Amino acid sequence: MKRFALLVLCALALLGACSSKKPAGESYSANLSAYNHTEDYIHQFYVDGAGGGNSRPYGGGGSFVCCISSPAQWRPGLSATVKWTTSSGIPGDKRPEAITPRWHEKVVPIDRYDVPGGLMNVHFLPNNEVRLVLSNMRASAKNYPGPASPVKPPDWKW
């Protein structure tokens, strides 16, 4: 009888664990995607500790890395810590400062959103500026709320 009672208690505990849910609308997962608007090569980047891979100069948006959690509702002051390493993206640049990766870190505000999207688009801009756009669209989409996809300058040879 004790065994049966113990079995029933375990089964009830498991059922209770399976049925418990997070409150609706608490948070969403989004894939990370980088857009590099600079001539630097981005070796790696992280948003609140979630790794996002690398990005070539004036490139990005082609791959996604899972996942970062974001609140269902945007609020003033919502931000994330972005860390990344860069070096020169110009082939053959042998200057010590060009070949030694440099770490950068910034607390970056997340652009306002009405509906949380499935993509956290991380835009690396000139002068070590970063913009975070949570959207269901890529930067190439017509009504994308952030910066357009990076464009290589006409004199960029690589």
Each language-model region and where it sits:
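Bacterial N-terminal signal peptides that target proteins for export
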Residues: M1-V8
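C-terminal motif of bacterial Sec signal peptides marking the signal peptidase cleavage site
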Residues: A13-A17
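Bacterial lipoprotein signal-peptidase II cleavage site
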Residues: S19-E26
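Short structural boundary motif marking the start of a folded domain
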Residues: E26-L32
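Structural motif
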Residues: L32-D40
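A short, structured loop/turn motif at beta-sheet edges
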Residues: T38-E39, A72-S79, R112-V115
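Tryptophan-paired
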Residues: F45-P91
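Beta-strand-rich cores of mature extracytoplasmic or soluble domains
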Residues: W84-W158
